[in-house]
Amino acid sequence: FKAKGMLQGGLTIATIKSAVPKNFRTSHWVGIAKRARIVYFAPDRVSGAELAGLTYESLADPKWKGRVVIRASNNIYNQSLVASLVKNNGKSSTAKWSKGMVSNMARQPKGNDRAQILAVAAGEADIAVANTYYLALMLSGKKGPEQQAAAKKVKPFFPNQNGRGTHMNISGAGLVKGAPNKANAIKLVEFLLSEEAQNHIVNNTFEYPMIAGVSPHPLVVNMGLDFKQDLKTKVVNYGKRQSDALEVMTAAGWK
């Protein structure tokens, strides 16, 4: 939205800057909640030794050939993940990685994030890439008993723990250009970053809170909170590198 000239600056007050890590905000928009894009695995088919030191980069290793499910290249979650790889590893390296990922896919990409988790539960693949809140949503029973049962058959794994950390993305708020009540809009963002609002958000979306001192939903807590988040890669780079990400995925034959 900022790139299209739809947002204005102004989210620079001290309360916002102190609440939100700098990689999750700019003067035009700010993260309100976080989600991690992680790996889900079948514990009966994937060993601890295979997972040791697993990174997004190593998902292209030939040992995972025919074992991986992930969404299509037109999905924004995947575009952001691949954009982060372009930022950290370069376009050429990420192009090679994309080809490895396509080679390792158990099937052509189809369905949403929950469909990837369901595929692992059904034995169609051994590992899936999906956002954290989807597993919690399935475990909650809100998507029905079949998805709840399937979710219990997989385990979460947080990649890149020995390096930059697990890929994080945000739900955010921005200031629309020309908004007549800029001062009140900033106050709304401040409220969304309050303990009261953060508790409401995380217990309804299954995301991670943006501010310290607020606990996620118990189903998210059960997935583990002691993991290293990627605080190095600024979210703004996901947009800047999006076209490169889509280019390398398309060239690799990532449907």
Named regions from a protein language model:
Residues 1-6, 24-51, 83, 168-173:
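Periplasmic solute-binding protein
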Residues 7-15, 29-30, 57, 145-167, ...:
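Short beta-strand->loop
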Residues 7-39, 57, 67-70:
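A structural signal for short loop-to-beta-strand junctions that line the ligand-binding cleft
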Residues 44-53, 86-95, 179-185:
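Short helix-loop capping/hinge motifs at secondary-structure junctions, enriched
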Residues 57-76, 84-86:
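Short loop->beta-strand "edge-of-pocket" segments that line small-molecule binding or catalytic clefts
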Residues 73, 77-80, 84-159:
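Ligand-binding pocket segment of bilobal, Venus flytrap-like solute-binding proteins
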Residues 171-232:
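Mature extracytoplasmic/periplasmic domains
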Residues 216-255:
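Extracellular/periplasmic bilobal clamshell ligand-binding domains
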